Swiss-Prot record:
Positions that bind ATP: 20-25, 77
Boundaries of every Glutamine amidotransferase type-1 domain copy: 306-536
Function comment: Catalyzes the ATP-dependent amination of UTP to CTP with either L-glutamine or ammonia as the source of nitrogen. Regulates intracellular CTP levels through interactions with the four ribonucleotide triphosphates.
Descriptive protein name: CTP synthase
S-S bridge residues: none
Lineage of the species this protein comes from: Bacteria, Bacillati, Mycoplasmatota, Mollicutes, Acholeplasmatales
Note: CTPSs have evolved a hybrid strategy for distinguishing between UTP and CTP. The overlapping regions of the product feedback inhibitory and substrate sites recognize a common feature in both compounds, the triphosphate moiety. To differentiate isosteric substrate and product pyrimidine rings, an additional pocket far from the expected kinase/ligase catalytic site, specifically recognizes the cytosine and ribose portions of the product inhibitor.
Nucleotide-binding keyword on record: yes
Gene Ontology molecular function, alphabetical: ATP binding; CTP synthase activity; glutaminase activity; identical protein binding; metal ion binding
Assigned protein family: Belongs to the CTP synthase family.
Domain of life: Bacteria
GO cellular component: cytosol
Enzyme Commission code(s) on record: 6.3.4.2
List of catalytic residues: 388, 512, 514
Length: 536
C-alpha cells in the first residue's frame, strides 16, 4: 500500500461492552460537525460478517438494506451517514468480511500471490487496508471516519482490528485517531455509575495494540468529572478526551451534544489541523427546537410484512419524520401486519388513519392483505403512498377491481396468472446480484401530480427490485383517463410512477424515495404525502 500521496486523516470507531451502542450515530454526528467546519468527510462501515453484502439477509435479522446511488446493498448505518452528512455514500463505503475473503480467494486462484501461503496476516489485513485507502481516494476525503462493526472481543472482528492497528504505523500517529465507545451502566437502585465494564473493554483493546485517544461513554445519566477522572486514571487516557453520549429522544441532538463538549476541537488538535472555522449548527438547533414544539399530529398506517422489527423500514420512518417536522406535526405510525388484514376487519385498522403507506417486500406472503389496504385507500379517498412492491400491488388492485381483469397478478406471486400486469425484467441466476439496483433517471409527464410535486422534468431515484409493471398493459390502464403512468425511465421505457387523477392523493413509485430524504431537506414525495394526510 503506497501511502506517500495520501493526505487523508482516519478516525477509527470501535465499540465495547455491548452491541448496538450507537457507533453509527456517533460517527455520523462527528462527520456532520467536521463537515460543518469545512472538511470533506466520508464515512466507511467495516462489517465482520461473512455475507458479501446484506442483500439476501432477512430483514428480521439485519433491518433494512440501504441502497446507494451506485447500486450497493449496504448496512442501514449508511442511511444514518447520508442523512446526517447530506453526502452520498458509495459501494466503497461498506466493506464486509465476505467481500474481503472473496477478493483474497479470487486473487489466490488467479495466482496473484505467486504460490505463497495465504494467511490472515498479511493477506487479509492488507486487503482491508487497501479498501480503506480506496475509499479515501474515491471520495477525495480530508477525513475518513471508519466504524468497525461488532464489539471488541468478537472473534470475527480480529482481522479488522489488526488491520486498523497497522494503519497508524503505515500513516503516522498524527494521521490516525482511535475512538472507543462503551456503555457505562447506571444502577438506579444505588444511583451508581459502574465503570468496570469500560475498564475491561479498554484493556482488551489495548491488548490488541490499539490505544484510543478518545473515549465516548454511552449513558442514561450525565457523567460527573469525578467518574471521568477515575476512568482516566485506570485507562491511561486524558480526562479531557472522555466525552459522554447521553440517551437522547431526538437523534440529531447528538450533533449538538458532542459539539458542545468540544470533541471536534480535540480531533482537529490531534490531527494538527488549524484555521478551520467553528461549526455553525444553527439549522440543526432550529430543527430540534421545532421537533420539541410540534403542535399537530398525523397518523400514518404502515402496512407491512416485517413490522416486528421496525428497523426493516428505518429509512421510510425517517423520511416520514422529516416531512412531518416540516409541517409542524408529530408523526404517529400505526404498524399494521398485512397478514392480519381481511375484508371483514379492514375498517378497524384504518378508520383513525390520515394516510396509508404500503412499502416494499419480497415473496407472496401478506400480499392480499396489502391489496385490501390499497383498495380501502382508493375507495375511501384516503391519501395513499406505495413504494416498490407497494406500487406493483396498486397496479394489481386497480387491474382486478377497476379494469375487472380477473386473477390479475404479479409473476412473482403467480406464474400462471392470466393477466401478468407485473412482470420480471431480470432473469434469475441466484438471489444475490439479480436486482435492478442504484440510481436511474425518470421522466415526469406534464400536468400530473408527480410533476407538480417534484417541479422538474427529469429526476433520479434509487431502485431495488426484480419486477416491473408490464408495459403491454399500460395503454389498457390509461384508457379510462384516470390511471396515469406519470413517470417513465426513458432508457428502457419502464414504468416508475403511477397515480390516479380522481383521487385526492394516490401515488405509487417503483423506486425508493426514502433513501434520498434528509432531515433538513425532506423528500418532495414524502412532503406531499404528509401534507395530503393532514388535509384528510
Amino acid at each position: 500500500m503506497n501511502n506517500k500521496d495520501l493526505k487523508t486523516k482516519f478516525i477509527f470507531i470501535t465499540g465495547g461492552v455491548v452491541s448496538s451502542l450507537g457507533k453509527g450515530i456517533t460517527a455520523a454526528s462527528i462527520g456532520q460537525i467536521l463537515k460543518n467546519r469545512g472538511l470533506k468527510v466520508s464515512i466507511q462501515k467495516l462489517d465482520p460478517y461473512i455475507n458479501v453484502d446484506p442483500g439476501t439477509m432477512s430483514p428480521y435479522q439485519h433491518g433494512e438494506v440501504f441502497v446507494t446511488d451506485d447500486g450497493a446493498e449496504t448496512d442501514l448505518d449508511l442511511g444514518h451517514y447520508e442523512r446526517f452528512l447530506d453526502e452520498n455514500m458509495s459501494k466503497k463505503s461498506n466493506v464486509t468480511a465476505g467481500q474481503i475473503y472473496q477478493s483474497v480467494i479470487n486473487k489466490e486462484r488467479e495466482g496473484k500471490y505467486l504460490g505463497k501461503t495465504v494467511q490472515v496476516i498479511p493477506h487479509i489485513t492488507e486487503e482491508i487496508k487497501q479498501k480503506l485507502t480506496d475509499a479515501a481516494l474515491f471520495h477525495k476525503s480530508d477525513v475518513v471516519i471508519v466504524e468497525i462493526g461488532g464489539t471488541v472481543g468478537d472473534i470475527e472482528s480480529s482481522p479488522f482490528l489488526e488491520a486498523i492497528r497497522q494503519v497508524r504505523f503505515d500513516f503516522g500517529y498524527r494521521n490516525v485517531l482511535y475512538l472507543h465507545t462503551t456503555l457505562v451502566p447506571y444502577l438506579k437502585k444505588t444511583k451508581e455509575i459502574k465503570t468496570k465494564p469500560t475498564q475491561h473493554s479498554f484493556k482488551e483493546l489495548r491488548a490488541l495494540g490499539i490505544q484510543p485517544q478518545i473515549l465516548v461513554l454511552r449513558s442514561e445519566v450525565p457523567i460527573n468529572q469525578e467518574t471521568k477522572n477515575k476512568i482516566s486514571a485506570l485507562c491511561d487516557i486524558n480526562s479531557q478526551a472522555i466525552f459522554e453520549a447521553l440517551d437522547v429522544d431526538i437523534l440529531y441532538q447528538m450533533i449538538l451534544n458532542l459539539n458542545h463538549q468540544g470533541i471536534d476541537d480535540f480531533i482537529l488538535q490531534h490531527f494538527k489541523l488549524t484555521n478551520f472555522p467553528t461549526a455553525d449548527l444553527q439549522a440543526w438547533q432550529q430543527l430540534i427546537t421545532r421537533i420539541q414544539n410540534l403542535e399537530k399530529k398525523v397518523v400514518i398506517a404502515l402496512v407491512g410484512k416485517y413490522i416486528v422489527l421496525h428497523d426493516a423500514y428505518l429509512s421510510i420512518v425517517e423520511a416520514l419524520k422529516h416531512a412531518s417536522y416540516q409541517y409542524n406535526c408529530k408523526l404517529e405510525i400505526k404498524w399494521i401486519d398485512a397478514e392480519k388484514v381481511t375484508s371483514d376487519n379492514i375498517s378497524s385498522f384504518f378508520e383513525d388513519c390520515d394516510g396509508i403507506l404500503v412499502p416494499y417486500g419480497f415473496g407472496n406472503r401478506a400480499i392480499e392483505g396489502k391489496i385490501l389496504a390499497i383498495n380501502y385507500a382508493r375507495t375511501n379517498n384516503i391519501p395513499f403512498f406505495g413504494i416498490c412492491l407497494g406500487m406493483q400491488l396498486a397496479v394489481i388492485e386497480y387491474a382486478r377491481n377497476v379494469l375487472h381483469l380477473q386473477d390479475a397478478n404479479s409473476l412473482e406471486v403467480d406464474e400462471k396468472t392470466p393477466h401478468p400486469v407485473i412482470t420480471k425484467k431480470i432473469v434469475d441466476i441466484n438471489l444475490g446480484g439479480t436486482l435492478r439496483l442504484g440510481s436511474y433517471s425518470c421522466h415526469l409527464k406534464a400536468n400530473t401530480k408527480s410533476k407538480a410535486i417534484y417541479n422538474q422534468e427529469i429526476i433520479y431515484e434509487r431502485h431495488r427490485h426484480r419486477f416491473e409493471m408490464n408495459p403491454h398493459y399500460v395503454s389498457l390502464f390509461e384508457k379510462n383517463n384516470d390511471f396515469v403512468v406519470s413517470g417513465i425511465n426513458p432508457e428502457q421505457n419502464l414504468c416508475e410512477i403511477v397515480e390516479l387523477k380522481s383521487h385526492p392523493w394516490f401515488i405509487a413509485v417503483q423506486f425508493h424515495p426514502e433513501f434520498l430524504s434528509r432531515p433538513l431537506k425532506p423528500h418532495p414525495l414524502f412532503k406531499g404525502f404528509v401534507e395530503a394526510s393532514l388535509l384528510n
